[in-house]
Amino acid sequence: MRNEMHLQFSALSQNESFARVTVAAFVAQLDPTLDELTEIKTVVSEAVTNAIIHGYENDPSGVVYISVIIEGHTVHLTIRDHGKGIENVEEARQPLFTTKPELERSGMGFTIMENFMDEVNIYSKVNEGTTVELIKHLTKSKALCN
């Protein structure tokens, strides 16, 4: 069985915690380990923060889109924006790369996503936006959505 959720919200930094908690509540039906749930919450925070700060440059008129699909023991997350896009995705994936060096703890978002998820795909076009697809295979899951 498959279960899915879709969410959209204004590109405001205070909505990052809302997105993180909402996704965690949805994924909790699979009874993930605490580590798995923490990793999912962390990558949602990183991807949403990237969309708000880098994609929309803190323009609250932007909209961030999240979809979560559960299939068996696997969680598929997609975070999308219609912001300014990424010129060079491979460069952006390098640890410590940032276009905003003035920001604290910049340059680790994609590295964190790659360390916590089983698969990370990033699609981006300049002036059209970015889509981040994240896949996590849960290890100790009762998988209520079989």
From Swiss-Prot:
MF-aspect GO terms: ATP binding; protein serine kinase activity; protein serine/threonine kinase activity; sigma factor antagonist activity
GO biological process: asexual sporulation; negative regulation of sporulation resulting in formation of a cellular spore; sporulation resulting in formation of a cellular spore
Catalytic reactions on record: L-seryl-[protein] + ATP = O-phospho-L-seryl-[protein] + ADP + H(+); L-threonyl-[protein] + ATP = O-phospho-L-threonyl-[protein] + ADP + H(+)
Entry keyword set: ATP-binding, Kinase, Nucleotide-binding, Serine/threonine-protein kinase, Sporulation, Transferase
Enzyme class: transferase
Protein origin, superkingdom: Bacteria
Enzyme Commission number(s) from the entry: 2.7.11.1
InterPro entries for the chain: Anti-sigma-factor_SerPK (IPR050267), Anti-sigma_F (IPR010194), HATPase_C_sf (IPR036890)
Residue runs in coiled coils: none
Stored PANTHER family: ANTI-SIGMA-F FACTOR RSBW (PTHR35526:SF3), ANTI-SIGMA-F FACTOR RSBW-RELATED (PTHR35526)
Similarity section: Belongs to the anti-sigma-factor family.
Primary role: Binds to sigma F and blocks its ability to form an RNA polymerase holoenzyme (E-sigma F). Phosphorylates SpoIIAA on a serine residue. This phosphorylation may enable SpoIIAA to act as an anti-anti-sigma factor that counteracts SpoIIAB and thus releases sigma F from inhibition.
The protein's name in its UniProt record: Anti-sigma F factor
Organism in which the protein naturally occurs: Anoxybacillus flavithermus (strain DSM 21510 / WK1)
